[in-house]
Amino acid sequence: MRLSKPVLLSVSLVLAAPAFAQNVAVIRFPELQKRLARPTDTTYVVNFWATWCAPCVKELTNFEQLRLTNAGKKVKVLLVSLDYASQLDKKVRPFVKQRGLKAEVLLLDEPDPNAWIDKVDTKWSGALPFTLIFNNKTKQRTTYERELSATELTAALKKFQ
């Protein structure tokens, strides 16, 4: 049986989409730090979370909603999981797939949080959830060490626009 190129392309895209949507990259802090230091006019909304953190899980839909609302704008939602790297295939990827998260998800592979937390924000105690919103071009920056509602998240982002 011979399939046409458009049919093959369509089937390939359908099969590849779920795998792409669930891609979770494992990174170290220096790599994350470089990404956060880029001199762009994009506003970044970076949420530090974990699958075992109930308030984190509850607010993830708010970040997805924010991502969708700001599609096409210079706003980037980045979800940074603090689960253990050993849990990537057992917990994190299945969790991301089950929740239908489409924002970029990174798993931060750093065994000692005390070595990097102050580099994200000196006022951060290390508690989750933690959200950092910043724009390097305008030098605006704000942080939240608590769960954010959709309304609070939208209002926080509006201060950057």
Please report, for each region that a protein language model flagged, where it lies by residue.
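Thiol-/selenol-based redox modules, centered on thioredoxin-like
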Residues: 130-161
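Sec/Tat signal peptide C-region and signal peptidase I cleavage site
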Residues: 17-21
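Bacterial N-terminal signal peptides
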Residues: 10-16
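Structural microenvironment flanking redox-active thiols in thiol-disulfide oxidoreductases
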Residues: 60-99, 113-117
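Short, internal strand/loop/helix patches
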Residues: 95-128
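A short beta-strand-turn-helix
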Residues: 23-43, 67
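Short pre-active-site segment immediately N-terminal to redox-active cysteine/selenocysteine motifs
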Residues: 42-44, 49-52, 84, 127
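Conserved redox-active cysteine motifs that mediate thiol-disulfide chemistry
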Residues: 48-62
